[in-house]
Amino acid sequence: MGRGRVEMKRIENKINRQVTFSKRRAGLLKKAHEISILCDAEVSLIVFSHKGKLFEYSSESCMEKVLERYERYSYAEKQLKAPDSHVNAQTNWSMEYSRLKAKIELWERNQRHYLGEDLESISIKELQNLEQQLDTSLKHIRSRKNQLMH
């Protein structure tokens, strides 16, 4: 016998809400991974918990590349839909502000990762890339230190 349909409304019980979020988040990440494999689609998923914790998934390429591609696409779409070439300056500034704000958030997240913080939300592939970047940086630092010492 199958389960009944769940009524789409906020779960009032905090513990039940957290358990549901955790289970559904795992299912959502799994579905994102499945569609990327089955359909050879480039998939990125960003989820923030009610406490602001980030959970993300990105197929093959890194999240930054996908977000930059999305920004370029969104900007191009908005330019095509503009009625004339003199689009409202306020809209352009708002778009630029949003784009720069997203970039800053990305840099801040990367900085936290470089400092070893907030690593629970990234995949094994991203952890391997991070480790490789840190190894390369450490080699450069040691090389420079050795130059200065001799």
UniProtKB/Swiss-Prot annotation:
Coiled-coil region: none
Annotated GO biological process: cell differentiation; flower development; positive regulation of transcription by RNA polymerase II
Note: This is a truncated version of CAULIFLOWER that may contribute to the 'cauliflower'-shaped floral meristem (curd). This trait has likely been selected by early farmers during the domestication of modified inflorescence structures.
Signal peptide: none
Subunit and partners: Homodimer capable of binding to CArG-box sequences.
Cellular component terms per the entry's GO annotation: nucleus
PROSITE patterns per the UniProt record, alphabetical: K_BOX (PS51297), MADS_BOX_1 (PS00350), MADS_BOX_2 (PS50066)
Alphabetical list of Gene3D superfamilies matching this protein: Transcription factor, MADS-box (3.40.1810.10)
Span of domain MADS-box: 1-61
Keyword DNA-binding: yes
Function: Probable transcription factor that promotes early floral meristem identity in synergy with APETALA1, FRUITFULL and LEAFY. Is required subsequently for the transition of an inflorescence meristem into a floral meristem. Seems to be partially redundant to the function of APETALA1.
UniProt xrefs under SUPFAM superfamilies: SRF-like
SMART domains: MADS
Domain (K-box): residue spans on this chain: 90-150
Species for this entry: Brassica oleracea var. botrytis (Cauliflower)
UniProt key word DNA-binding: yes
Summary of the tissues where the protein is detected: Expressed in some of the meristems of arrest-stage cauliflower heads.
Intracellular or extracellular location(s): Nucleus
UniProt entry keywords in alphabetical sequence: Activator, Coiled coil, Developmental protein, Differentiation, DNA-binding, Flowering, Nucleus, Transcription, Transcription regulation
Protein name per the record: Truncated transcription factor CAULIFLOWER A
Principal place of residence: nucleus
GO-annotated molecular function: DNA-binding transcription factor activity; protein dimerization activity; RNA polymerase II transcription regulatory region sequence-specific DNA binding
